[in-house]
UniProtKB/Swiss-Prot annotation:
A molecular function GO annotation: mRNA 3'-UTR binding
Entry's Gene Ontology cellular component terms: ribonucleoprotein complex
Originating species: Homo sapiens
One of the GO BP terms on file: regulation of DNA-templated transcription
Name of encoding gene: ELAVL2
Domain RRM: 39-117, 125-205, 276-354
Name used for this protein in its record: ELAV-like protein 2
Quaternary organization: Interacts with IGF2BP1. Interacts with MAP1B light chain LC1.
Gene3D superfamilies hit by this protein: 3.30.70.330
Region of interest: Disordered: 1-33
Amino acid sequence: METQLSNGPTCNNTANGPTTINNNCSSPVDSGNTEDSKTNLIVNYLPQNMTQEELKSLFGSIGEIESCKLVRDKITGQSLGYGFVNYIDPKDAEKAINTLNGLRLQTKTIKVSYARPSSASIRDANLYVSGLPKTMTQKELEQLFSQYGRIITSRILVDQVTGISRGVGFIRFDKRIEAEEAIKGLNGQKPPGATEPITVKFANNPSQKTNQAILSQLYQSPNRRYPGPLAQQAQRFRLDNLLNMAYGVKRFSPMTIDGMTSLAGINIPGHPGTGWCIFVYNLAPDADESILWQMFGPFGAVTNVKVIRDFNTNKCKGFGFVTMTNYDEAAMAIASLNGYRLGDRVLQVSFKTNKTHKA
């Protein structure tokens, strides 16, 4: 049975607060553990393009640092938006919290607090949330989930052109048990302002280990004819040479779908004005948007992903679309992913044409 949920705990912290803000939030979002280390800090809501050296430089201005680590995705190498800074002197750590917590960096307002010691209980606590109301803000998302535990990071995916929410978000809890409780309490429920129930699940739960292994092969496998995006950055091939190699040698026999042509069809479709649309065919019935984000994200800026689902079963109909802002990045993604085996299926990836499947 669907249940209409009430708002969670409220907090008077704002995303656009001053450089130093008061932590007056009573929810677990900003709770610290006074019994833990007084030198090790966790820094949340870092800009996606911030490097570890920049993080170290920022916090090194406060005092001498023993260690600094920007946490990255093990598969893609992309920043997860948070990191750890360990000072030598506890006084410097306290000063860093007082000085840098609430600092505005680009479009982010960072959060600095004492870190908990690493343990098995805090791993795999990242949740994938879909079906969110398009009007829901990141603060409201945190309020909804904060009743279940301490939130490390949160994110709502938005269209980079319009700025409108895609109705999809991520919540990373301090502990896995907190994430499990959030799934029990919120999955299939209706948050305030929603007309449909939301879906809450682990971003990388046990049932997705196969996909994770596949994606790992995509970026790391030495047996791939064409290296993944991380390896490509180290190659000295120009993009045009790579494309010539990718499509000059037939890697498999692509089927023709409704007259659809691949990039090898010579004619590249025109730019639609909002990005380059890529058609992805032969997806599995249980494929979802998160797989497309993980596959295409490392190649460049992705503004939209969409898996086309059957109206009656809500299962993937076998294809989807990915929109990227940059042509070269989109072409590179196609060169690497067209003909790639995802599970027991060989993907067909091409620029969308007028004859491509329609949603």
